[in-house]
């Protein structure tokens, strides 16, 4: 039977057929189509059809194409009886058959027979159709649309085109045109299920009309694109010809080449349209200038800055909290609050990214405050590593000119952008981690206030459109994560401080330093000096000896320096002897390498009258503060020395007044205050000192002198005093307690109002090793710190 012979006598068709459920394929009556058969039951159905010499099968679309073994409810009721024209076996156990649709049919019964599906089918014939004007118009229109579709580029087999044009039966014409429509299987099934030939013709006509409309639009787009390409190609061809002529004549146009190069860079830079407009405006100015003029050089430098900035380039944030925490833990010991803050930022960032709403997030502005050597700068580097961002450090120590932050205007000779834009260019991404180091040491002079310039940089509401004076166009800094570092907060202006989230880094205890040395400092120094842990081994005893005898600092910078010194001496010894053996570092070996210990950890055993151990906080950590008080013949004057500030002087006056007011309770003759002058001295005299925290220590010293009771040398104290003897809270207590611990003093008197802060900030092992006494009145301090009255033994001996 030929592919498109006249319709068979449908009465000769059998009533049962092997079934092949199809996926994504509809075969219409009269349509010839190749099918690839892979499922075993479908292959069996083909074999059954061929074995019976009928060659008939029934094709019906599967409702769910993913279902491997469909049931009756999974198969459309209306399908097509088809005849197998040709069959070919493939290498992958599949078969390929060429089929021709014969007639529509409706499944009446479905059963499984010998591993294939067999269906009972009711043949559906097209009814006779009256040749109305509408039918004639639809047929003519369909054939016209066919010609139009071919002219617009639709690919159709020429033989099929001729057959379609020769067909006059509405139903058959509709089926043949439907077979060439670019529609989905479900739409084709809907057409197959339309049993009225005229209605089917209408639906097919509408779908074909829509498809031709799309083809017309596609052709219009293609023509527009081709014209644009041809125009570009023509311009390119002409430029290449001009270039070739210039090269032939030895007249290479370097200026035009430079302009074209800048144009290309501007287009590729990803800068916003308004900034691109400014760049092109400057490029036009450059085009009109002599290439060797000074102004041309200024414009070139400006354009270079514009095209090299990362307007739209950013690194992809690492949003895995476990990996980020692991990186932070590997690089730094403890610092849990800071690590927690970074992980919070990452969590928020991840939630915002997953949200379908606003995905932008402002970078946090953190300020790490703490003594030198506690890891502020290196922590910033670790944060960048954890976030998978670029890291740039800007040192602000000693910066006095506002233009160093905001840039110089282009009218000045040698003008350049400020440090912020330079850092962005260096990072090559618009979302780096930028560390503003030593922000507390920014200077101020007649050239402006750099801290005022930082107000805009560090304000998330303003830095979205930060304008550098040199660029003159806005740059978005909102995605930058700014981290500031400082040793102290009192020198940072209040408006600038308000824009930052302050995180304090305290000094390290001896135990923490031991851990840091073992886990971080020693491996780092071994690697830097070409040795390994197999060659050099530090015992815990040796590290502790090194910490106590050769370093007295809040951080670990000097400790690392001393470790490096020891390792370098070992490296020298290995080279000199030519023998590489294992060195076990002991306290005696440290003495041999570094000399006698610089610091003594033993406290003074002798209790003295008028000598009190106070505690002070400095920008380099906590310190022991010896306060000396003595009385001498005079008229009740108060003498203060030791470079004391106004607040500390007032504390001394308050202390003196309190002791005077409590003379009776303390057993002091009130007349003594008029007979003697009081001298208070705080060594070292060259170092300025201020603050109210020495109040209780000064009061204790004065009381000691007038009562002749020695002060315990194994007790340190800190706290502010009032005229009523109340002990008020002070700051920097963790650093002060660690300073006392370093000095071997285990008993520390502290204000009661600071108890909660101390208990939360101090590590448990430090709390256990110290005797912390919390007081709210100076009388409690006297009971703890003052011993019984000193006997006048020395005077008696001198008389005899």
Swiss-Prot record:
Residues 17-212 form the Lon N-terminal domain. ATP binds at residues 370-377. One of its GO terms (biological process) is protein quality control for misfolded or incompletely synthesized proteins. It is found in: Cytoplasm. One of its GO terms (molecular function) is ATP binding. The keyword Repeat does not apply. It holds the Pfam family Lon_lid. Its main location: cytoplasm. Its EC number is 3.4.21.53. Induction: By heat shock. Transmembrane segments: none annotated. One of its GO terms (cellular component) is cytoplasm. Residues 606-788 form the Lon proteolytic domain. Disulfide bonds: none annotated. The keyword Protease applies. The active site is at 693, 736. It catalyses: Hydrolysis of proteins in presence of ATP. Keywords: ATP-binding, Cytoplasm, Hydrolase, Nucleotide-binding, Protease, Serine protease, Stress response. Homohexamer. Organized in a ring with a central cavity. Belongs to the peptidase S16 family. PANTHER family: ATP DEPENDENT LON PROTEASE FAMILY MEMBER (PTHR10046). ATP-dependent serine protease that mediates the selective degradation of mutant and abnormal proteins as well as certain short-lived regulatory proteins. Required for cellular homeostasis and for survival from DNA damage and developmental changes induced by stress. Degrades polypeptides processively to yield small peptide fragments that are 5 to 10 amino acids long. Binds to DNA in a double-stranded, site-specific manner. This is Lon protease. It comes from Sulfurihydrogenibium sp. (strain YO3AOP1). The gene is lon.
